[in-house]
């Protein structure tokens, strides 16, 4: 390839824009029931699609959304759940319902892609993210929180506003939780073209975006559903109070697939022994999280920290665990209701896998991608937008560059080659400089 051709390819990649839509609730296992809809079919015929997106543990919406947007695991970005308790300070995080949840210095310590892009002088627009209330510095150029009137991206007039934003912004992000909210009520097993009305509305709005992508040479669309959902029959809900003396428990945090336990001082091993050996909860297992002692699977990356106590209960898919005693749960005033379908389980469980869809000039045409991870999607966005300063991610571009068109892939690899040369030269210069200084 000539230098002129390479420069041209790099300029083409440099000029690209991205719309990233996070549409929670589309399960990879059940996506085939919906793939025939026009708004989805375009990705199979003209773009890239995968039904094997591996989420991170716990497979809950907020930790996975933040991993997708930061490119790092929850243990690094700190959002370990939707309900969190700093057992050292007593500070609570209540799933973006309390003002204190939005304090950047307390909870939001790793920059997501929209802040990194803003720092890199890219123009960023965000729609319907609760995170718009965080006091980011610098703040995105446009950040619209969830609307009070209930309008979402699935409403045509709102979708048209998003389309217009793609003409003036380099990165447009849309958060759409409505599909998940509906599937949580009806369950994924019952979701089909008749019952999943939110899916129908969403894919119709999506057609407006794909039409815009088709008409332009600079716009690309990525749709991600980070994880799936699992039906939980009412008879599969376990109550912690029935299996351990609650006077041994200081408090429990969260409910459903994962519940943290903070024992009374000096009672941690007794609680563990009760729940592991004497009166184990059927289909729910207790684990230590302490390093070297912890017995959770390594791929969970779930270790003791200021928001992860010594003990955690993990339910098998299709089961859930709650606490009856409101004085022994965090937050105390909230009822621990388990919906028809929930998430949070083993991130390797097939029904937890999510969906990835991509369409635009930088992507291949009609390509069925195999497995990929949320961090990989972060890396793809960084490379397409050519943003410097992205987080040192758990994603790998070489794991996913097969989804790119041949020209884009060549430009990406050329950039990687230049970066590797720069790093090699820098590593050689450091000892030389030290020798000069010492001499």
Regions found by a protein language model. Name each.
Residues 1-15, 427-438:
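Cleavable N-terminal signal peptides of Sec/SRP-targeted secreted and luminal proteins
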Residues 67-188:
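His/Asp/Glu-rich, glycine-adjacent segments
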Residues 28-77:
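Short, structured active-site-proximal loop/turn typified by the sulfatase FGly-forming signature C/S-X-P-X-R
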Residues 51-69, 128-134, 393-401:
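Short, solvent-exposed turn/loop segments enriched in Gly/Ser/Thr/Pro and often Arg
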Residues 408-429:
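C-terminal GPI-anchoring signal of eukaryotic secretory precursors
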Residues 253-380, 388:
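Active-site neighborhoods of enzymes that stabilize oxyanions during catalysis
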Residues 227-264:
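Acidic/histidine-rich catalytic neighborhood
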Residues 20, 39, 201-240, 381:
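Metal-dependent active-site segment of extracytoplasmic phospho-/sulfohydrolases and closely related
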